[in-house]
Design a protein with these regions (language model features):
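Extended, low-polarity transmembrane helix blocks
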Residues: 1-27, 31, 41-52, 58-159, ...
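Short juxtamembrane and helix-loop transition motifs at transmembrane-helix boundaries
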Residues: 25-37, 160-173
Length: 270
């Protein structure tokens, strides 16, 4: 399985998981889908869209259509739900701002992952869906948006390093410095993806790091048995983390024709 296939697999199962939790709990996806009182009682419809979209991403003949639907649907989360809420909340300092915009960034990264999978699927198809949504420029925009999200991830690791450290398994030493290191990794990845310098290497390392978050942080939480009042949150966090890792692998797959280091043609926007 290549990098792009791994991204599609992880993203698809992540979407199915988020949707399944919404269906079981009959609610929206908590802070990742802050609908509030705008459209009550439609959580299961949202969950069904995510489940079907995730399933479609895994099926060869349907993956382009499914990726398009998820790009639009997650785009609504980002721009219709998260952005207005984050702007209205504001923030008096960078710590408050990073916390306010974290949900926006996580949804933006997942939207970027869906968009990247759409563009990559369309490149393999003889009949282009919409060139302006799937050409090299669109792929570059999706990659840049993922980079912006990574900057927010990094800022939140520093702003809430104490909380981040507690999420790291206790058997891993120096958890607080590790929270800083992973935060720096997010920021460096964001800068690389936005600038196009060392983008393939950065995206791949980001994907590895996010995959380790799934394995070392979120899976053990589930295995340990989440508290009943936190069950929906813990399961949703697991599948969001899986979707984010899948998005990172998809972004890395979109850079497969670029060199790993410096040199001619190394810039992702070249």
């Amino acid at each position: 399985m290549n990098v792009r296939g791994l991204g599609r697999l992880m993203f698809g199962f992540g979407m199915i998981g988020i949707g399944a939790v919404s269906l079981v709990c009959d609610s929206y996806s908590l802070q990742w889908e802050p609908v509030g009182s705008l459209l009550p009682n439609l959580g299961r419809l949202s969950g069904a869209i995510l489940c079907l979209g995730g399933l479609g991403v895994l099926i060869g003949r349907l993956n382009m259509l499914a990726a398009a639907i998820l790009t639009v649907f997650l785009g609504l989360w980002v721009f219709a739900l998260q952005a207005p809420q984050a702007i209205a909340a504001g923030g008096s300092d960078w710590k408050a701002l990073s916390g306010t915009w974290l949900g926006f960034a996580e949804d933006l990264a997942m939207m970027s992952g869906a968009w990247t999978l759409l563009a990559l699927s369309d490149q393999d198809d003889n009949d282009a869906m919409a060139p302006w949504l799937t050409d090299a420029r669109a792929l570059r925009i999706a990659r840049t948006l993922f980079g912006i999200a990574c900057l927010v991830f990094g800022a939140s690791h520093f702003a809430f390093s104490d909380i981040t450290a507690t999420m790291i398994p206790s058997w891993i030493p120096e958890r607080l410095p590790l929270a800083w290191i992973t935060g720096a990794g997010h920021i460096l990845t964001g800068l690389a993806l936005i600038s196009g310098i060392l983008a393939r290497l950065a995206a791949t390392l980001e994907a590895v790091m996010m995959s380790l978050f799934v394995l070392l942080v979120h899976v053990p939480m589930i295995v340990a048995g989440p508290a009943r009042d936190a069950m929906q949150l813990d399961w949703t966090m697991l599948f969001v983390a899986l979707s984010l890792a899948g998005s990172a692998w998809a972004v890395a797959g979109g850079l497969r024709d670029k060199p790993w280091g410096f040199g001619k043609g190394a810039r992702a926007d070249a």
